[in-house]
Structures are given as C-alpha cells and as structure tokens.
C-alpha cells in the first residue's frame, strides 16, 4: 500500500520501499503550480532520477537546468547539487527513483522540521 506524505508544498506518495528491492526506492511527487522547493541540496550517498508524467518541471543539476515535459527525465549523480520548481500553471506529477532509497521516514522527518520552523518563525 502506498504512503502519502506532504513536505511543505510537495506531496510524496511512496510506491516502492527500498527494503523490498535491494535498495531502489520509487515515489510519485506532486508539485503545485508556482512551487519553488526544495532549496539547492545534494545527497552524498544517493543517486536520483526524475521522470515527468504531467506538467513541466524545471530541474537543475549542478550548472544544467532543463524544463522537463511528460516523458522527459534527468538524473542526479551522488554529490551533485540539485533543485526543482514548477514555473507552470498546472500541477507537476513525476516519478522519482532513489538508490539507495532514503525511505518515507526521511520525508516525514522533513515535514516535521518544516512544521517546527513555521511555528517558530
């Protein structure tokens, strides 16, 4: 059964847990129009690949930025700085694959951190 977590403006629906696949995690991400999240970041231990299903996702890896349309994909090697946004007028839906998986609990913890920051700020 899939698990849904909201992290700020991002909705994440976990489809495949890495514990079931020897390390590969897969989730569907929904990003509303106008969303510019997350800030630039990197994963030292994880490879990431995004495949767009609907909408146009602006995806940046290091110094390369592309507007990904349905059927387009882009990969993020370990240690590469990346971020994404939805500058369009419709919700973006994309599949995100991580290896090794960081797990749904990582996103729950991120969501709790955002809630705490919002309450204090």
Language model segments and positions:
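Structural motif
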Residues: 11, 49, 56-58, 65, ...
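Ligand-binding loop in jelly-roll beta-barrel domains
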Residues: 58, 78-104
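Acidic/histidine-enriched, glycine/proline-rich intrinsically disordered or flexible terminal extensions
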Residues: 105-121
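Short, conserved beta-strand element in jelly-roll/cupin
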Residues: 28-32, 42-60, 97-99
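Short acidic-glycine-tyrosine-enriched beta hairpin
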Residues: 63-81
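Short, charged/polar surface micro-motifs in flexible loops or helix N-caps
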Residues: 20-22, 32-36, 56-57, 65, ...
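A short glycine-rich, His/Asp/Glu-containing loop-to-beta-strand
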Residues: 3-40, 46-47
């Amino acid at each position: 059964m899939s698990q849904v977590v909201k992290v700020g403006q991002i909705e994440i629906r976990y489809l495949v847990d890495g514990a079931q696949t020897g390390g590969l995690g897969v989730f569907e991400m929904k990003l509303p129009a106008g969303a510019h999240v997350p800030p630039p970041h990197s994963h030292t231990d994880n490879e990431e690949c995004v495949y767009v299903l609907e909408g146009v996702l602006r995806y940046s890896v290091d110094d390369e930025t592309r507007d990904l349309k349905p059927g387009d994909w882009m990969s993020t090697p370990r240690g590469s700085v990346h971020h994404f946004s939805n500058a369009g007028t419709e919700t973006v839906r994309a599949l995100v694959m991580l290896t090794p998986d960081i797990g749904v609990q990582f996103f729950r913890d991120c969501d709790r951190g955002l809630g705490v920051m919002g309450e204090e700020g």
